[in-house]
UniProtKB/Swiss-Prot annotation:
It is found in: Peroxisome. The keyword Flavoprotein applies. One of its GO terms (biological process) is lipid homeostasis. One of its GO terms (molecular function) is fatty acid binding. Residues 682-706 are annotated as: Disordered. The lineage of its organism: Eukaryota, Fungi, Dikarya, Ascomycota, Saccharomycotina. It is an enzyme of class 1 (oxidoreductase). The gene is POX1. This is Acyl-coenzyme A oxidase. It comes from Debaryomyces hansenii (strain ATCC 36239 / CBS 767 / BCRC 21394 / JCM 1990 / NBRC 0083 / IGC 2968) (Yeast). Keywords: FAD, Fatty acid metabolism, Flavoprotein, Lipid metabolism, Oxidoreductase, Peroxisome. It comes from the Eukaryota. Its cofactor is FAD. Its main location: other.
Amino acid sequence: MVSATNTVNSGVPPNPAASIQAERAASKFDPKEMHYFLEGGEERAEKFKQMMQQMERDPILSANFQYYDLTKDQQRELTALRIDRLTRYIENESFDDFNKRMSLMGVFDPQLSTRLGINLGLFVSCLKGNGTAEQVKYWAMDKSAVYMRGIYGCFGMTELAHGSNVAGLETTATFDDENDEFIINTPHIGATKWWIGGAAHSATHCSVYARLIVGGQDYGVKTFVVPLRDSNHDTMPGVTVGDIGAKMGRDGIDNGWIQFSNVRIPRYFMLQKFCKVSSEGDVQLPPLEQLSYSALLGGRVMMVLDSFRVSARFSTVALRYAIGRRQFKAGSASDDKNALECQLLDYPLHQRRLLPYLALSYIISASAVKIETTIESTLENLDKAVEADDMGAIMKSIDSMKSLFVDSGSLKSTCTWLAAEVIDQCRQACGGHGYSAYSGFGKAYNDWVVMCTWEGDNNVLAMSVGKQIIKHILGVLDGKKVKGSADFLNNTEQYLNEEPVLRSVDDLKDLKKVLLAIEVAIIRVAYQASQTLKENKGDFDTVGAEMVTLSKLNAHHFMLSEFLDRMDSFESKQLVPYLESVAKLYSATIVLEKFAGDFLAQGVFPPKLNGELNSKHIPELCKEIRPNVIALTDSFQQSDMMINSAIGSYDGNIYENYFGVVKANNPPSKTKAPYSGALEAMLNRPSKEERERFEKSTETAKILSK
């Protein structure tokens, strides 16, 4: 951190570092032990710290404050340099470890992790999800796509006129049986591939989603590997690409557009793990085509982990600032000339504003690790089943995939929405200094909010999850059973007739009862939506709002359930009371308070308890957590390099650090701006009379009026 180097003072300067150091010294638990909980075990936690240290010491990868002053072109150049550097890492570590490295990079340079993720997380995952074993080996390994040597892939799904409606994509892949080739074509402007990360300048190949046309028949959207650039990095004949230009954020990514003008590719460039086309033009359709979209799951799962780390980063910044920053004298101290001003976090309102986001960060951690391990095992089992052509195992994997689609969809949408809220609300809690680029909030917010849109628009994803929950409810009422994380829906008939689950403040403190309350709310909202459906002839658009609510509640149920399971099995029992406090605050504020309308409408708790929730329960929890805030944020173990905020460093020296960064990046010796000429022309312009040559002056009037 750069010091402001102010050595002469005529008064006593503020000392925010002392406040933070004092609270750190008073910590009642070891943040290192808590970090093991957050990362899902000591081994994962140690790997996290090793990788963080490597990147911090790497002169190319390490973050700094110049990052916030870079132009679009400078961001892209830096991103390219960092990608080149990271290829050396991927050649020397397992893919699992490199994925962990990408996750950490997403904290301080999300555009870098995205550029890598486009190739590894989308292009290569598309190969694995849709290609045969031979195709995966050829493109990913033999052609070195996984090492970004020779091939750098992009993911060509979205079009100018279609995004969420994948089935409506209009790029065509027409089979030419005479030449054993597919002809890839963009029939009109709406079918232009759009927002394609890496397409503008980087990608050599694209996994193109296009309509399979054989013998004049449309077989729907399939995937094809289409070369974009040759070995000289010049575009291939018939391929036209362009840069989309400046975006709200992530300018380090060269998002582009692509148009194909009758581009020919060999038949075997079609990925044929499921759908197959023979040289004679015979089409073999997959029995369960939805499996081909498994490539999207990895990205959604990664976003849950990103939500945890980003929320942890900015709740840490805001809370350190709130402890170091003092404003006004509160209570009896207001008349004491020698009393210090009050720390921001000692104001009850500030606690209500920030502490729920600290709690949320903790809760997301458990579900992030759980969903990550679940997808790894599920996809592995599916691949084995498909390779062995074992229909029994395939059907079992499909059941797991369906559950995973629901859980990952609700978690991706809910967590990315919440993380966006965390960044912005924490920024507001830091006042004017939070608006500085060097606080990190501004760029992070602009970079983050695309997460609410790509790889499944959040509202569309949420509605698909809610729709599935409603279908489950109808199935249960018809005698069917639900498997997986939503098996509580099997209690539908019982929960429809239950009395209020939460009746007292003591019930609010019982996390198992809160979990039950969420289950009851989900069942009752879903049942009510099913009745609305009947009244509207099964039109799901009439229950869009309810479907989004169901998805959010499903995510909160998953997160709280996983957190409680991990807490129960955690070996360091001395940390459990602190974890319970965090979970109670999360459930009280992020769940019960935010969804109070639904809980009240469904009779899950009475109106009187809602009043006690706000006036008594939440303030008590904030007061309980307040002394441990520094220890709880230190437990994230994010270094100053990862946090990269001038007002959120570990030492707490807010003003010296912030002033030092400002001076270093904007040297006060440069007193004239590049546009000083325009300012000087304005300030030193002649008077209006002089510019009019004094032709309208009194003297001129006297002369001309004679």
